[in-house]
Amino acid sequence: MADTAPQVSFKKRSVKKTNFRKKPESPPPDADSDSSFTSSDDEEGHRIKRRRKNAAVSASSTSNTRRTTTSDEPATAGAAVPLTASNDATKHSNWYDDELNEKNLLGTTRARPAATGADAPDGTYKGAANYQSFIQKNPNAPAKTFGPIKAPTNVRTVTFMDYAPDVCKDYKLTGYCGFGDSCKFSHMREDYKQGWELDRDWEVSTKGKNLGGKVVSQRGGQAGEDEDDEEEQLENIPFACIICKKPYQNPIVTKCGHYFCESCALQRYRKNPSCAACGAGTGGVFNVAKKLNGLLEKKRERARQRREQAIANGEEVSSEEDEDEDEEQNSS
């Protein structure tokens, strides 16, 4: 009997039926009643009091206000700044304004009577303020302003005074520049004078003389008409070698028509076979410049004539030109 297990039975408890009160439906509140509470009676006589619910929903809570303020801040911070037209390019410089002069700001000390017409004098002296003008003025005449004239306010001028112009060193030493007309430096070999010195020299040179032409370019007489191709050729020939910056030693000429020293041209050809002046290929062809000495002699003669003419006119001659002439004569 010990092997038999005891039987266990579970009792299922039944759920007690409880009497739940059914809440009766409350009648709708009157629309005219102002009280926020409503009351109703149930079946057993108990009075139930309910709070009246507002039909309208108010959204004026603190959290909503904070959210609205926070959401509005980025919109205000990211708003585009309004652009204002400055018109700096066409801005006027009103240094003196007619509306802000002393007369309009301070006013006149004494108001003069309006000119109604000249009356016949009755012999009574009424003071200097009552003087009358019997001159009939033209009412249509424009008003005259006295004093300095007002300068335009919408015009800007930029003045650059170049007292020491940059001179091309290659052109000043040799008379040749590889850049040609595109060189940014001045191709000049003379000294510079102030404006009053130039005016003085012009007055001294033209005093008591009849000038040949009506314009400045024709006042040299027939000098401008005698220029020919030879003059242009002489101007294009450097008076010194552009490689060594010294007078020509055994000059040679290339196929492109440029002159160099023989030693300078051969030494350059070992490293660069192109022409030192124009960059064209020489091909190793260097001819003896037989006519160069004659051309340079003509160029020196014309420079000497111009120098003598300048001295005769009372003009100053650069000392560098004298040194160049001495060196050329010594080398020849």
Swiss-Prot record:
Regions of compositional bias (Acidic residues) in chain numbering: 317-332
RING-type ZnF: 241-279
One GO cellular component, as annotated: U2-type spliceosomal complex
Region (Disordered): 1-95, 299-332
Keywords on record: DNA-binding, Metal-binding, mRNA processing, mRNA splicing, Nucleus, Spliceosome, Zinc, Zinc-finger
Compositional bias annotation for Low complexity: 55-68
CDD domains: RING-HC_RNF113A_B
UniProt entry tagged with the keyword DNA-binding: yes
Annotated Gene3D superfamilies: Zinc/RING finger domain, C3HC4 (zinc finger) (3.30.40.10)
Subcellular location: Nucleus
GO BP field: mRNA processing; snoRNA splicing
Major location category of this protein: nucleus
Segments of skewed composition (Basic residues): 10-21
A molecular-function term among this protein's GO annotations: DNA binding
Taxonomic superkingdom: Eukaryota
Cross-referenced InterPro entries: CWC24-like (IPR039971), Znf_CCCH (IPR000571), Znf_CCCH_sf (IPR036855), Znf_RING (IPR001841), Znf_RING/FYVE/PHD (IPR013083), Znf_RING_CS (IPR017907)
Zinc fingers, C3H1-type class: 162-190
Function per UniProt: Involved in pre-mRNA splicing.
UniProt-listed PANTHER family: RING FINGER PROTEIN 113B, ZINC FINGER PROTEIN 183
Complexes and interactors: Associated with the spliceosome.
Family, as annotated: Belongs to the CWC24 family.
UniProt name for this protein: Pre-mRNA-splicing factor cwc24
